[in-house]
Amino acid sequence: SWGYNPNHFFAYDKAYGNRNLYKKFIDECHKRGIAVIIDMVFNHATGICPMAKLYWDGNSTAANNPWFNRVAKHPFNVFHDINHEYEGTRKYFKRVLEYWVEEYHVDGYRMDLTKGLTQKNTGDDAGKWSQYDASRIVIIKDYCDAAKSIDPETYFIIEHLGDYSEEKVYAEYGILPWRNMNNSYNQVAMGWASSSN
């Protein structure tokens, strides 16, 4: 599914029709000047994800599963927390990013909760989790490079909401941080400027 319960990252939800219809939809969007941005969720996956099932232990991923963390490294995790330090994970997700640009000609990605692409264990401390994380920067830049390897104009938008010093690194690299500013803009557009900041 494309939602917040991902399981197969090379497959879209059947509600989008078959492969040819989905490609036609994207082509029709492009004819009308509409960019197609896929919302990607790489920080977690459901238990039916093949990489979770490969190493399964009762109701959870097994302790020896290199793809997943048995216990989430950050406070906002749902389902199974993905280990992005594992080389197999990185290769897999880079190929996913290349695939959708190459095969379907999507224009880019909005990457959900990229702050969760970390192995730095902050437990339930959201403040620590938001701090500058050099290893996370390497991972996110690596994914951006993969997305842009097929088409350098590919949009790479991150929902990060972390420390400004970290987000500045991304912006200087050409990554587009989304800082949840749309609510204020919506307020102004609707004429409610007095309640926006």
PLM ranges: what are they?
Residues 105, 133, 138-197:
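Conserved alpha/beta catalytic core and glycan-binding cleft of carbohydrate-active enzymes
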Residues 36-38, 109, 156-158:
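Hydrophobic faces of well-ordered beta-strands that scaffold small-molecule active sites
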Residues 1-105, 113-132, 143-149, 193:
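Substrate-binding/active-site clefts of carbohydrate-active enzymes
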